[in-house]
């Protein structure tokens, strides 16, 4: 049998079987202890059931993506949620979330919540910056369910994580989407008599033919793992200019005849995005110097 790990507690994994609402409790085979591969929420797996009706994970299929905070495999898209007011938008923070999503190869949709508090025209430069970078934007008022129908359609056939700073309404959005009646995993603890009083872990929730990670993504915004070569490919609007600079391996920093810098001057790349890139690049380079 094959299915998806939707929850893991204390060495037990709960697998939702394909084309069924059946959830089977499994342990991982001992062979996984001798490899670097540990089962994760979101893993697509093959399982077996023994004569005592005990489940075991036999195989973990190749992951399309892998997040670490929260630890979830095979996420396909991120809804990056911000507000312009309450709390006020922090452009660098928004860019950092976008950077982490790109690093993890996630499709990104930017959601601006609490639109009832602001006039969109006052923020047209920020909106233009995001659109210029190639991201779709959805304007929301989650409390009043404005445009939440669009979000629900996006979730279908995807594994979706919500991310963004505190206070922007991620939990409200999740609650509006999930609703108690759709929570297939909601009664696992009761049914299996395990997990009720354990530390809370991420889990996947099936809703509208899609999967939601039930805890906000990127609880850490640390980018210490990133190298300058990674950074180059995490700013999507730079990609059109790769190979057009004078120097191979151009970092678009102090090098002359740089196609990216020219694109910034001509308005094809937003200056805020370029400034964020330079600031992040210098952080990475300074960290590397300290290492040595």
UniProtKB/Swiss-Prot annotation:
Keywords: Cytoplasm, GTP-binding, Hydrolase, Metal-binding, Nucleotide-binding, Ribosome biogenesis, RNA-binding, rRNA-binding, Zinc. GO terms for cellular component: cytoplasm. It is found in: Cytoplasm. It holds the Pfam family RsgA_GTPase. Its cofactor is Zn(2+). InterPro entries: G_CP_dom, NA-bd_OB-fold, P-loop_NTPase, Ribosome_biogen_GTPase_RsgA, RsgA_GTPase_dom, RsgA_N. It comes from the Bacteria. Gene3D superfamilies: Nucleic acid-binding proteins (2.40.50.140), P-loop containing nucleotide triphosphate hydrolases (3.40.50.300), Probable gtpase engc, domain 3 (1.10.40.50). Binds 1 zinc ion per subunit. GTP binds at residues 113-116, 164-172. Its EC number is 3.6.1.-. Its main location: cytoplasm. HAMAP family: GTPase_RsgA. One of several proteins that assist in the late maturation steps of the functional core of the 30S ribosomal subunit. Helps release RbfA from mature subunits. May play a role in the assembly of ribosomal proteins into the subunit. Circularly permuted GTPase that catalyzes slow GTP hydrolysis, GTPase activity is stimulated by the 30S ribosomal subunit. Monomer. Associates with 30S ribosomal subunit, binds 16S rRNA. Belongs to the TRAFAC class YlqF/YawG GTPase family. RsgA subfamily. This is Small ribosomal subunit biogenesis GTPase RsgA. It comes from Clostridium botulinum (strain 657 / Type Ba4). The lineage of its organism: Bacteria, Bacillati, Bacillota, Clostridia, Eubacteriales. The gene is rsgA.
